[in-house]
Amino acid sequence: MNETLELIRSRSNLARPSTEVVVVEEIGSDEDSCPAFGFLRGIRDRALSIEFRFANGNSQAFPYSWLGPMNYNPSAGLLLKFVGDMIYLVLIEGSNLNALVGGAVSLYDRGVQRHRVSWIREMTPQQAESATPGAVVIDRIRIVSHRSDDEPKGADWLESFDRCG
C-alpha cells in the first residue's frame, strides 16, 4: 500500500507529509486579570461571552449579544439584564466595582460596557479580606431568571435599583 501511495504522490506532485516537529511559541495572552475579574487587554478587543464564577465552583455564562440595560448603583451593585430564551437578571455586589485596574480597565464603564470583561468571580470571605485597599471586591453574584411575560420572583434585592432610576 505504501508503494501505491508513493506512486500516486509522485505522479500528482503531492508533497510527502512533513515529519518535522513544529514548535509554536505563545507570544502572550490577550487576557489579563485581577482577583475579581478577567479582561481583554486590547482597547478594541471584545469578548463574545461573560462568565460568572461562583465561590462554590459553579459558573454560568451568557453571550454579550444578550446583554441589555445595565444599572450601576455604588451602594447596591451592578445589575445586568440578559435577554435570550428567558430574561436573566444578574446582580454583582461588592465594593470598588468601578475602580481602575492597572490604570486601563474597570469592571463597569471600561469593562462590561465595552464588552472587555470575560469573567467575574465571586470571592470567598478570605479572598475579600486579603484584597488590597481600593481593589475591586466581588462579595456576591445573584442570578434570577423569569419569562418575559412574568415578573421575577424572590428577587427583593431589585428594589434598590427601582429607586436609582
Question: What residues fall within each predicted segment?
Answer:
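A short macromolecule-binding patch
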Residues: 61-63, 86-96
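Helix-rich interaction surfaces within compact, conserved domain-sized segments
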Residues: 3-17, 91-165
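Short, conserved, surface-exposed binding loops centered on an aromatic residue
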Residues: 41-43, 59-60, 70-71
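Glycine-centered tight beta-turn/hairpin loop motif at sheet-sheet or coil-to-beta transitions
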Residues: 55-57, 83-87
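Short acidic, Gly/Pro-enriched loop/turn segments at secondary-structure junctions
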Residues: 73-84
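Short aromatic-glycine motifs in intrinsically disordered, low-complexity regions
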Residues: 47-61
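Phosphoinositide-dependent membrane-docking surfaces
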Residues: 63-75
